[in-house]
Amino acid sequence: MSEPECLIEYMNRHKDWAVIVCLVGGGQEIHDGEAGIAEWFNAINEHFPSWKVFCSDRMAGYEYVGNSSIDEFLSNAEVHKSRGLHLSVSMRSFRSELVSAFAKAIIDGDEATATELYPKIIQIDSATNKMRYPILLTRNLQTAKEWVRNISHGTERYGIIASSGAKRLRADGVIVPKDIEVEKWFLNGKDDVNSSYFMEVAASEFKIQGLEIDYAVVAWEADYRYLDGKFTYNNFAGSSWSRVNNPIAQNYQKNSYRVLLTRARQGYIIYVPKGNVEDATRNPKYYDQTYNYLKKIGVIEI
């Protein structure tokens, strides 16, 4: 029994009526057992068709219902769609409500939409030349670290975040461990080597999902690389990369980058490694097209 089915079954015991309010984000499934809004729809359609469903009319994207549709998922239930039920303003990135849409466009390979959104997000002030919500690009890790240090003030938190599949960042001196001391990473101060401030240990999508920091260095590895006009899915095991062909695993990997690109409250810088021609696991061609793709979108490089 799935978690949605279990909860609905429990609420279904009420003799008169009951309401379940679900706040479900799209594209947040990053591991086995996570199925998002689709699992709620399945539970209602297959086991509780007498329940009425009131939902947003904008849940048509792949990150919500895959290749299906709301009507197909809920063919046995009564459905009421309303634009007013779509929570489109991000409470995480309070300086720009378009950050999530920009992240979606990037990972979808939607260059045109990403290019259109980028200047609307950063909003450069003509008087001060400062960005409202900076999103930058670099191929120098030290430059990325210096940027987040310099732009933050007081107790504003910064750190490095990376995909759990970013195994070769180790060559740059950045470890992405399976487990970190989360409370120390997020809460401890600049005098603790285990805190995010030291930028030696990166938090993966599993550790930062549902949380956020003020400024982030988003390290973009070769696991989700842009190649010949589209993103490819890759896994590092042993001493080499291999393609990921399972559609479910591909979706988890894509969503991992969606999570990473939406964790910064006030801005972030994307670090794309240069690679190393003498290291077959860090071949520059694994990174160059991703970098060029982001440059073509217009992301400002420092």
Q: Where are the language model's segments positioned?
A:
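Flexible, charged surface loops at secondary-structure boundaries
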Residues: 12-15, 148-155, 262
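Well-ordered, non-membrane alpha-helical segments in soluble/globular domains
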Residues: 1-7, 34-41, 67-71, 141-142, ...
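Loop/turn-to-beta-strand initiation segments
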Residues: 15-21, 52
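Conserved helicase/translocase motor-coupling segment
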Residues: 29-38, 45, 51-226
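Conserved RecA-like ASCE ATPase "motif II neighborhood" in helicase/translocase motors
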Residues: 1-13, 200-204
